[in-house]
A protein has these predicted regions:
Chain B
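Structured beta-strand/loop patches that form or line metal/cofactor-binding pockets in enzymes
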Residues: 17-56, 60
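Short, thiol/selenol-centered motifs that function as redox-active sites or metal-ligating centers
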Residues: 61-67
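Alpha-helical macromolecular-interaction surfaces
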Residues: 67-68, 87
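Alpha-helical support elements that line or immediately flank enzyme active sites
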Residues: 69-79
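C-terminal binding/interaction regions
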Residues: 1-25, 82-146
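Secondary-structure capping and boundary motifs in well-ordered enzyme cores
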Residues: 38, 65, 119-123
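A generic structural motif
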Residues: 60, 78-79, 130
Length: 408, 146
């Protein structure tokens, strides 16, 4: 696919269109295109009622919007059944749901939970909790300094004691894609289930839950241009069916007596309370937008921008990129350190040129410890970034050490 | 507020070549101060004799603002009484919150170079880390016989 760097997609995004912001914090959250903002507005203008309740026209319209979104997501991730798609408020809630409903009920003393060293805290803390309550043991699958998880590491780490493997498809610090299909195969041979955190990958990799054969998958809408506060949990139907509800209350029941309740069928068993229907509608619009642009095109363009930036950074002295040496393994994420300049100072100086980057430990402290740094600066790209964005970033980046009083 | 003006020579000098960033084996007080959200981590050491700060130093790491601010503070409190040091701490924190007079900024000497932090809410914690740790040492040891 040939990508023309001069074609700009900024015009689709009001925040970018109407400003000179150089937005390079896409791994934290993406900007929202007009079509998503308009879809949310239209829901409140024309379809607002409590979905899944009420027998009047408006309530049925709201329900239809919510269910249309579910169908759109099902197709987007290639799930087998619509009821395998559960709306949550984001990746964090999705993983907490799995940990609380599956982990707390199907794990016991001596069972092992395997997570990778590059997990975001949202895929660490729920498992630390499950381990502490059930007596299960939390183990770590380690990568090399380039972020690669080898076949040998996978074979050695997954044993018959392993019950859950929870792993990110794409590290939010390294940008490296993990060999999920390989991990799933080995895990299943040992009778373990696989939970895939797709928060970071969903915008870069075409997710096919059936091809990957993952048992659970979670992502947040806001990283793929939908509103904040809407996310997805995918789970295989046979697993979801045997799990108890996570949250209890309205909308997740068939009937309730003074002492007991019969829970609703999937997916509603896991959607207690009023769904974020406007968020779901926004998510549907975002997926439609992605489909209209083309996932492959978006990714190719992101890789091209990543490479341009990667090559330019490599020419600046005293800057060290974290992870793979090949920019194609970075998937839009370049984390780096600058000798003797703290990432918060880097971020503040870049901010003067309207460049937005993330500084800190990126909610992945175990990875930072493992790779031997306390914090770093991260620039992350999406297809709507431009060559000008990179030029502005690199120009500002090049002057930082001098501004901080160093001679070079 | 332009950052290029903000990272002035006083700040960068104290960050790159701190005078008081070293251990102090005969310290009478030592306290760790941390900003968990951003990773600034210092341990402040004081040698206090008869309520007078005879020496002050710090170790640790963090952003330029946290390091320079701690170094400037150490410079300022050496030779002062506990009460004077606490008065400066209170004044410095007020400066960072944006409610201080020009006379007070003058009295804060080099620490006055950090006054523009009052326009940078994200960096307030970095600037006050050393001073907060100083306050905490004296609050925790109010009854200590020094």
């Amino acid at each position: 696919m040939s990508i023309n760097v001069n074609i700009s997609h900024r015009e689709d995004f009001p925040l970018l269109r109407d400003s000179n912001i150089v937005y390079l914090d896409n791994a934290a959250t993406s900007q929202k295109p007009d079509c998503v903002i308009e879809a949310v507005e239209e829901f409140y203008h024309k379809h607002n009622a409590n979905p899944l309740r009420g027998f009047y026209e408006l309530a049925m319209l709201a329900t239809e919007q919510l269910e249309n979104s579910r169908t759109t997501v099902k197709e987007f991730i290639n799930a087998k059944f619509e009821e395998e798609v559960i709306f949550t408020k984001g990746t964090t809630e999705s993983i907490n749901l799995i940990a609380n409903s599956y982990g707390m009920n199907f794990l016991g003393e001596g069972d092992e939970i395997l997570i990778s060293i590059m997990e975001h805290h949202c895929n660490i803390l729920p498992w630390q909790f499950v381990a502490s309550k059930t007596g299960a043991v939390l183990k770590y699958l380690e990568c090399d300094m380039d972020g690669l998880i080898s076949d040998t590491a996978i074979e050695e780490a997954i044993t018959d004691k392993t019950k859950i493997v929870a792993i990110t498809q794409l590290s939010n610090v390294l940008g490296r894609e993990n060999p999920i299909a390989r991990i799933t195969k080995t895990a299943h041979e040992h009778g373990a289930i696989v939970v895939m955190d797709a928060a970071q990958s969903v915008v870069h990799v075409k997710i096919d839950v059936q091809a990957l054969d993952v048992d659970f998958m979670a992502f947040s809408g806001h990283k793929i241009m939908s509103p904040m506060g809407i996310g997805i949990l995918y789970g295989k139907k046979e697993l979801l069916n045997k799990m108890p509800p996570f949250l209890r209350g309205g909308e997740m029941i068939e009937s309730v007596t003074r002492t007991d309740a019969v829970f609703a069928q999937l997916p509603y068993k896991f959607e207690a309370g009023t769904d974020n229907a406007s968020g779901a509608v926004g998510l549907m619009a975002a997926i439609n937008y992605i489909n209209s642009i083309g996932m492959e095109y978006m990714h190719e363009r992101t890789l091209m921008l990543t490479k341009m930036c990667f090559d330019a950074i490599c020419k600046i002295p005293h800057i060290h990129i974290i992870g793979a040496k090949d920019s194609n393994n970075h998937n839009g994420i370049i984390s780096f350190t600058i000798d003797n300049v703290h990432p918060h100072d880097v971020s503040q100086i870049l901010s003067e040129s309207n460049v937005c980057v993330r500084a800190g430990h990126h909610c992945a402290q175990p990875l930072c410890d493992f790779l031997g740094f306390k914090s770093c600066t991260r620039a992350s790209f999406m297809f709507y970034n431009t060559q000008e964005d990179i030029d502005t970033f690199i120009k500002s980046l090049s002057g930082i050490r001098k501004m901080m009083g160093y001679g070079d | 507020m332009e950052t290029s003006n903000f990272y002035n020579e006083i700040l960068t000098e104290h960050n790159i070549r701190p005078y008081h960033k070293h251990d102090m084996p005969d310290a009478t007080f030592s306290l760790n101060g941390v900003n968990p959200s951003c990773g600034d981590d210092i341990t402040l050491k004081l040698k206090v004799v008869d309520d007078v700060i005879e020496d002050a130093s710090f170790i640790g790491d963090g952003c330029a603002i946290s390091q320079a601010s701690a170094d400037i503070m150490a410079d300022m409190v050496i030779g002062r009484s506990k009460e004077e040091a606490l008065r400066l701490a209170e004044m410095f924190i007020r400066m960072i919150k944006g409610s201080v007079t020009n006379e007070e900024i003058d009295e804060l000497e080099e620490a006055g170079a950090l006054k523009d932090i009052s326009h940078m809410p994200a960096r307030v914690k970095c600037a006050v880390l050393g001073w907060h740790t100083l306050q905490e040492i004296f609050e925790k040891n109010e009854d200590a016989n020094t």
